[in-house]
């Protein structure tokens, strides 16, 4: 059943949001507000899909409800999220119908960053882009164009287009957020790890604020653990919501997480609190690890992290006593120290030392089809993976990536080629990268906003202004699109179908991706279609042989119509039964389901790991001399500066949702947290206009005086201070903290650094 909603109906339904700034604007070419008439057509039945208001990708259902707009709720079939959505997820309808969203292609007619645009047809936009890409290819080589896409399904299409074009320089957003913990997982465990928070009895949390960053499944698990009596200890410089929920909050010195973890680990090892049997059977490199951290006593590390040695030792002893139902949470955004790879490896090693791997209330391997199948007998049915549709081989590229990922002895050998070290793109453009294989002449950016998400925004803007071509695919004129030559209008997540995905928690599963709830508004197109049509204009159509997204999906499931129908109806499908390799009851249930797996069970009724856990990295030792662990002091700020740290708010998603009317109305700017003693010394009172400044930039905001932050530290929420004047609600409000950050790339991990120094004064 289809429901049609006219522009008059829409304006009527939007009236309730008038106070939130939902004004029908005629000032921005190519926007929904510039259309004279628009019918909104969609399903009156609930359609299972995936939210895209942040990168957590929660499962949802949505439908059109007459003249009331689109109703969004959590998918009730998803037990991990309990059928819930957060404030951001609930505002998806508001983003869909935002008059300031882009629904037609636009091209720059003034200087970059001047904000002068004209509407163009898709054919005109494609022709311009294809011609410019060919010119760069002929003059400088295809490898001099970088392609960046935010993590998600759009990345599939545009990274494929990039490699068909001949560029190896494809990037995601990970080096500005979670890359180091993914690298650490590959180094220590050989792959990704999941956390069973709900069954844990003791959790150490170092700034992984799931209550404000909001991952609904994690929120529910943490709350279940707390309600069941688990002890949660939080270490971070400010009193976050996570810290408020915790049993203990310790205000650790910014950027000094690693000394705490090393002192904690030192206690486990040198007081013989670790699980000797587990380490001996399943781990390698223990003696090398022990030797590397011997100097890192709790007493020495306490002087660095500002947590007393007695506290470090007490927490380690309590943690070991609670194991294996104890988790040292390795976090998500990992941009706090130049030694991020060492820090995240250390956190993961702590879990291995207490033997919590593949245990209830501990950590476990993500079990996709290939991982799961290795424990099945020959006669047992196997979990299916998704097939990748066949395409021609990519052209051979002779020039290495600018980050040299893929080279045998490259510094960032643990990084994924599909993510890369994106912060190197501006440096390679401006010739600020010693030994770079090439200069970047063009940047194709898909639903990513480096002006707001990369450090030292002025450098990013300078790089954008110097390029031969900048193309953005987005739903709005973002801060980066503000400096583009062409902006192509992507659909919102409620207007498109996407590819299927395969993954696994405790057993393999498939996901629907996203399903279209309403027809695209204006002339917006989904990413798969933009990439396919542009490839045809570029003479690369053979690389996109599928007719449409439905054809692509059918090839993914190898023509399995039953699986196709189930995924479209339910939104997900799983295989087998949950498996925890070191839990006898789970292994017994697994063997009951798959009798052939009995041959994999050891004398203890458990299943051994497929490979050893690595507590010392021979490859890292070879490349950087850092196979073990150790602490290297770093100067984050000058003596007369304060530390600045940032975090997420539950009503903003990085730089993505600042202009969404409802969310902007909930939080227009980010007041900066200042300790009362610090504010008193500076003559600053609550609510005063203030200026933050250092040698890189200056930003203005308001003061929030609170004891919930260290005296030597300022705190602000991320996602404010937008520079695009076409984001009319969000422009110029609050602090873009990235503008104040130095351009620093952490060794071995390639992470940006989000802890830095600033001065503050009354504005």
From Swiss-Prot:
The keyword Amino-acid biosynthesis does not apply. Binds 1 [4Fe-4S] cluster. [4Fe-4S] cluster binds at residues 51, 54, 58, 86. SUPFAM superfamilies: ADC-like (SSF50692), Formate dehydrogenase/DMSO reductase, domains 1-3 (SSF53706). GO terms for molecular function: 4 iron, 4 sulfur cluster binding; metal ion binding; molybdopterin cofactor binding; oxidoreductase activity. Predicted to be exported by the Tat system. The position of the signal peptide cleavage has been experimentally proven. Keywords: 4Fe-4S, Iron, Iron-sulfur, Metal-binding, Molybdenum, Oxidoreductase, Signal. SMART domains: Molybdop_Fe4S4. Its cofactor is [4Fe-4S] cluster; Mo-bis(molybdopterin guanine dinucleotide). The keyword 4Fe-4S applies. InterPro entries: Asp_de-COase-like_dom_sf, MoPterin_dinucl-bd_dom, Mopterin_OxRdtase, Mopterin_OxRdtase_4Fe-4S_dom, Mopterin_OxRdtase_prok_CS, MopterinOxRdtase_cofactor_BS, Prok_Mopterin_Oxidored, TAT_signal. Residues 1-34 form the signal peptide. Pfam families: Molybdop_Fe4S4, Molybdopterin, Molydop_binding, TAT_signal. Residues 44-100 form the 4Fe-4S Mo/W bis-MGD-type domain. It comes from the Bacteria. CDD domains: MopB_CT_Thiosulfate-R-like, MopB_Thiosulfate-R-like. Functional polysulfide reductase is made up of three different (A, B, and C) subunits. Component of the phosphorylative electron transport system with polysulfide as the terminal acceptor. Belongs to the prokaryotic molybdopterin-containing oxidoreductase family. This is Polysulfide reductase chain A. It comes from Wolinella succinogenes (strain ATCC 29543 / DSM 1740 / CCUG 13145 / JCM 31913 / LMG 7466 / NCTC 11488 / FDC 602W).
